[in-house]
Swiss-Prot record:
Binding site for ATP: R114, K156, S161, S162, G163, K164, G165, Q166, E196, G197, Q198, I199, E204
Keyword line: ATP-binding, Ligase, Magnesium, Metal-binding, Nucleotide-binding, Purine biosynthesis
NCBIfam families from the UniProt entry: PRK09288.1, purT
Domain ATP-grasp, residue spans: 119-314
Family, as annotated: Belongs to the PurK/PurT family.
Keyword tRNA processing: no
Lineage: Bacteria, Pseudomonadati, Pseudomonadota, Betaproteobacteria, Nitrosomonadales
Pathway it works in: Purine metabolism; IMP biosynthesis via de novo pathway; N(2)-formyl-N(1)-(5-phospho-D-ribosyl)glycinamide from N(1)-(5-phospho-D-ribosyl)glycinamide (formate route): step 1/1
Record protein name field: Formate-dependent phosphoribosylglycinamide formyltransferase
Catalytic activity: N(1)-(5-phospho-beta-D-ribosyl)glycinamide + formate + ATP = N(2)-formyl-N(1)-(5-phospho-beta-D-ribosyl)glycinamide + ADP + phosphate + H(+)
Pfam families: ATP-grasp (PF02222), PurT_C (PF21244), RS_preATP-grasp-like (PF22660)
Amino acid sequence: MNIGTPLSPVATRVMLLGSGELGKEVIIALQRLGVEVIAVDRYQNAPGHQVAHRAYAIDMTDPVALRELIDKENPHLIVPEIEALNTQLLAEVELAGHTRVVPTVKAVQLTMNREGIRRLAAEELKLPTSPYAFADSEQSLRTAIESGIGYPCFIKPTMSSSGKGQSRITSPEQIAAAWEYAATAGRVNQGKVIVEGQIDFDYEITLLTVRALDAEGKVETSFCEPIGHLQEKGDYVESWQPQPMTALALGRAQEIARAVTESLGGLGLFGVELFVKGDQVWFSEVSPRPHDTGMVTMGSQRFSEFDLHARAILGLPVNVALSRPGASAVIYGGLDSSQLVFEGVEQALAVPESDIRLFGKPESFARRRMGVALATADDVEKARARARTAAKLVKTRDGK
């Protein structure tokens, strides 16, 4: 892989579609390798905008606006970081030959909604998953639940992230509200939902899976140590690495992750979500990009998930080794403000082996993720305690 000088005619140009906190870290990782980065998001001053060479705010589902920007910037790589994209245009762009979509257009199209990836995993690859059905009306949702899925169950938009639009219901009386919430709260209103039966699992993990080129130029699949995480209302609030697992469960998790990522193809890092009970493992979801629970790797690994993604998409070798047990804990905005001020940062950083990342989002909401605390220790439990302590020490106030 040749890498040219940024801001010159020979620059290696990468365009990120989606420039939130995860995209911001990918941009920084790419720039450390001498790449010229163009950050795109739906709103101005997104976290990634603040560190990129150039930044744009457009509707990325609009094929005309997206085409104009791609033609203007002429990137070598396009790296989707969100689901709400016009993937048909991306397919046309990649077919033209000059620009490569990371990891592949197929991966982006299938993972942008839960129906595509669930049908691939369960029906084509025959991987174990929770019982599921798709519904395009309240009545068909009710029928799916009552004819086999049962209670409790989860209702989710076919296209959403960070828990948006998700509900857990335990009775027929909750179906109408869950349908309305899921059908309208996703990234794009699809008018369709997935209903999943509840699995009796011990814990859930994210297995960061990297497809990269080895020294001979062959695609090699590597696995980071499993990441455990705690969720509230479908959104991650805490993660840790490594998550203890039996050798058999870990092997099965890696087999599932390998099967899914090989089918999706391309180069890059994938966040594969799995449920685990004893030695049993079920596939849940996959993201063809760094995962929010993987932010723990900024402290626990020699190369974070963002470094690994940057290296892999550029065709460079990767090292997935764990440096030290680590944990992350979310820092919330706590209030609605466009002038948020963080206090207590010095106290948070006084916690042993701690660090924080403040994302720089231009607008805060009470439950919006505005930062993350990181910590390492001799063992995971101590790291988790340190990360939680550091996160709680960071306070917010309105600066107006």
